[in-house]
């Protein structure tokens, strides 16, 4: 096999690959053995048609696609290794010669990982951020504790108010016609959560159980449905039931119920200590993130658009998984937020671009500084993870290995060591 790499522009180039005729004929043999099993010719059992008869009846060309499916992945992979390039997307393949008894010739247009020209990454300065724990932050944490231990109590009578869980039926109409996706029954909605289109939840306040109301809202101009975007709609709503949070009193009894402490003062002291530990971690994370962002800003990188799109794919998927944990789907989110996937991707694009830039920058710094993740480093990381998840390190290693995760773990450790270098060489100013 012969391969030639020619860079065309920016991060794109063309691999011209030539595969020996003997390999082509061998692939055609494999293709025939596969295809003939599905062919029925009078006078022959299925799968027993002679090769010459098959070719005279159907043509050898009928085997070409199956032979290409056999040849292309292996030839392309070998050519990539020989050329020493790192593709970041599937290639565009153009077969220029495919014929029995002749060499296979094809061209693969490839987008490759970009070159990173590092700027300053040592001695970077960042301004210190205030992460101090105040009485107000302790009180806010205790308030959240109250919220978590609040009891949802059915409201027998009275009007809906902000903070209530309203169970409603609703149906939306535009110009008097019901529109698709605008109807639900017994839907639980926390008033004030901002889940629905602006103005919807506010108009439910004051509604009594069993009452019906017509609510008028205006869809956002950028709403994913052009039939509704920027237009007024009327929702017919019925309030079926209400639940209200019954907040526990912050006293010694509360402390005993929710913790191992006997008094509220002890609980406050412990809460403050935990917040200080948490903010210390947040400060460390803030410093690391700021240094990485500065190093990435100082680097020159011509980002391939496809790398950003792949990152967006992952981010949208992650967002959908977070919604599922909250009992919502992406489809419902699009419906109630007035966005579609394209708009969500646009909203996430800046973060996706930053993530790709920082990843490439850290990889380049790691290479420049010869930073590697050793087996000892990875074993230490496995021990740390074992402590977090309460499982033996050997068991975690087996899990990572079974899921092809060890390479990713090595990369994560290498990245952490690279950021450690940035921190060690940095200056944090007040």
From Swiss-Prot:
Pfam families: FKBP_C (PF00254), Trigger_C (PF05698), Trigger_N (PF05697). One of its GO terms (cellular component) is cytoplasm. It is an enzyme of class 5 (isomerase). It catalyses: [protein]-peptidylproline (omega=180) = [protein]-peptidylproline (omega=0). It is found in: Cytoplasm. Residues 163-248 form the PPIase FKBP-type domain. HAMAP family: Trigger_factor_Tig. Consists of 3 domains; the N-terminus binds the ribosome, the middle domain has PPIase activity, while the C-terminus has intrinsic chaperone activity on its own. This is Trigger factor. It comes from Brevibacillus brevis (strain 47 / JCM 6285 / NBRC 100599). The lineage of its organism: Bacteria, Bacillati, Bacillota, Bacilli, Bacillales.
């Amino acid at each position: 096999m012969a391969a030639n790499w020619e860079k065309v522009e920016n991060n794109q180039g063309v691999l011209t690959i030539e595969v020996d005729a003997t390999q082509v004929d061998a692939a055609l043999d494999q293709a025939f053995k596969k295809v003939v099993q599905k062919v029925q010719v009078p006078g022959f059992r299925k799968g027993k048609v002679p090769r010459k008869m098959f070719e005279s009846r159907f043509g050898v060309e009928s085997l070409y696609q199956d032979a290409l499916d056999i040849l292309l992945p292996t030839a392309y992979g070998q050519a990539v290794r020989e050329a020493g390039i790192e593709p970041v997307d599937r290639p565009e393949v153009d077969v220029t010669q495919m014929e029995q008894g002749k060499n296979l010739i094809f061209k693969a247009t490839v987008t490759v990982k970009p070159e990173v020209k590092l700027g300053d990454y040592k001695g970077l300065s960042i301004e210190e951020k205030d992460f101090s724990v105040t009485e107000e932050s302790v009180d806010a944490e205790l308030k959240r504790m109250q919220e978590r231990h609040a009891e949802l109590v059915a409201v027998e009578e009275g009007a809906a108010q902000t903070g209530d869980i309203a169970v409603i039926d609703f149906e939306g109409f535009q110009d008097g016609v019901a529109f698709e996706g605008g109807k639900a029954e017994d839907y639980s909605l926390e008033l004030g959560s901002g889940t629905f289109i602006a103005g919807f939840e506010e108009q439910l306040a004051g509604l009594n159980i069993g009452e019906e109301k017509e609510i008028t809202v205006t869809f956002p101009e950028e709403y994913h449905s052009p039939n509704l975007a920027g237009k007024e709609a009327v929702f017919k709503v019925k309030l079926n039931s209400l639940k209200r949070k019954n907040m526990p009193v912050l006293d010694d009894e509360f402390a005993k119920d929710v913790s191992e402490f006997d008094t509220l003062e002890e609980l406050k002291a412990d809460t403050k200590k935990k917040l200080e530990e948490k903010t210390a971690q947040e400060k460390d994370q803030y410093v690391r993130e700021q240094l990485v962002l500065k190093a990435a800003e100082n680097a020159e990188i011509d980002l391939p658009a496809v790398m950003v799109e792949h990152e967006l794919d992952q981010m949208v998927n992650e967002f959908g998984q977070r919604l599922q944990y909250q009992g919502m789907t992406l489809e419902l989110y699009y419906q109630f937020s007035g966005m579609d996937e394209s708009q969500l991707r646009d909203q996430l694009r800046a973060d996706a671009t930053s993530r790709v830039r920082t990843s490439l920058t850290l990889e380049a710094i790691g290479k420049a500084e010869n930073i590697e993740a050793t087996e000892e480093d990875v074993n230490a990381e496995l021990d740390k993870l074992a402590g977090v998840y309460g499982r033996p390190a050997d068991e975690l290693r087996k899990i990572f290995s079974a899921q092809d995760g060890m390479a990713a773990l090595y990369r994560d450790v290498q990245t952490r060591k690279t950021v450690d270098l940035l921190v060690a060489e940095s200056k944090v100013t007040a």
